[in-house]
Amino acid sequence: MILSEIFKTQLDPKVSYLHEPFERRYSLNLDLSEIFKPLIVDRVIFTLINKEMIKPEHFDQELNFCYLNDSGRKIFIQEFDRKLNSTLKYPKLERKVSYRYMLRLECYKLIKNFLEKKPYDSFKIYW
């Protein structure tokens, strides 16, 4: 999902700030995920737990590990997709944008950093 937004811009997904590039991994994808994990993924998890959408029967336990089973993954992906398509007011644009589009806006800020040599100011949760 982040990678698809990177590909819609002029950025090279192999060039990053935080993560070491590897042969079979796009490190910029990982850098941007660090910014948005708490905002998107963690909130989806808390929603699923607080609304009791995910229950113990949605997990499989093997050895000392616990995994979402197929029905649990389906619930998670549906809620994750709903979150990506929901909107919030983006401070600099002063209008609502989807969380998905917000990822692309972050890519544009990186491009601006490269081209205009302006300091990069990553997205911050503002509530």
Regions found by a protein language model. Give the residues of each.
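Active-site helix-to-loop segments that bind/position phosphate- or nucleotide-bearing substrates
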Residues: M1-W127
